[in-house]
């Protein structure tokens, strides 16, 4: 693998759709496991009806209001965890949902779906509000991998389904084994 370039807070503190697209091909490191990010979705502010912060700031959504570069982990359907990275400027609630990864260590495995990737990696509610910048066990890096991706509508939601804010790698063959 190429030299690690850890993503700085400034990477996350930008437009959420830009962050979501630029996270494609970045490498997620979590407690000794390594995975290439292959699918993301954007959730942006109180005007986005699918965003958890659409109804305002609550104890649950407080992390989404910044600062950027922290994890936002929550439980869905009472059984699956979802991993998000907080984006944008402090005070504006936004995050990128990590929907899919290609695990490259300790094994070669494609995981589509946020619940599957959290289960495999061992991410749970105790990993909510983790600083991704100052962390040796949980961070994101850039190894210079550029992957083709397509843009689609978000899935698994009932509101805001018209937004083209889902980004999916189109050529899994190009991923390193």
Curated annotation (Swiss-Prot):
Q: Which HAMAP family match?
A: 3MGH
Q: What does the organism's lineage look like at the top?
A: Bacteria, Pseudomonadati, Pseudomonadota, Alphaproteobacteria, Rickettsiales
Tell me the keywords, alphabetical order. Answer: DNA damage, DNA repair, Hydrolase
Q: Superkingdom, according to UniProt? A: Bacteria
EC id: 3.2.2.-
> What is this protein's name?
Putative 3-methyladenine DNA glycosylase
Asked whether the UniProt record includes Cell cycle among its keywords, one would answer: no
The protein's matches in InterPro entries, at most eight in alphabetical order, are given as: Formyl_transferase-like_C_sf (IPR011034), MPG (IPR003180), MPG_sf (IPR036995)
GO terms for molecular function, please? alkylbase DNA N-glycosylase activity; DNA binding
């Amino acid at each position: 693998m190429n030299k690690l370039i850890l993503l700085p807070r400034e990477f996350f503190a930008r437009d959420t759709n830009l962050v979501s697209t630029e996270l494609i091909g970045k490498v997620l490191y979590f407690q000794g496991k390594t995975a290439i990010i292959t699918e993301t979705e954007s959730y942006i502010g109180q005007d986005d009806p699918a965003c958890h912060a659409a109804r305002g700031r609550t104890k649950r959504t407080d992390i989404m209001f910044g600062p950027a570069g922290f994890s936002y982990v929550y439980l869905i359907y009472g059984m699956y965890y979802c991993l998000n990275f907080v984006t944008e400027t402090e005070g504006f609630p936004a995050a990128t949902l990590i929907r899919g990864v290609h695990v490259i260590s300790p094994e070669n495995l494609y995981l589509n779906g946020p619940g599957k990737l959290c289960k495999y990696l061992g991410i749970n509610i105790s990993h909510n509000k983790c600083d991704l910048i100052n962390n040796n066990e949980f961070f994101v890096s850039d190894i210079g991998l550029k992957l083709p991706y397509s843009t689609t509508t978000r899935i698994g939601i009932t509101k805001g389904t018209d937004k083209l804010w889902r980004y999916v790698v189109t050529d899994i063959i190009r991923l390193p084994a």
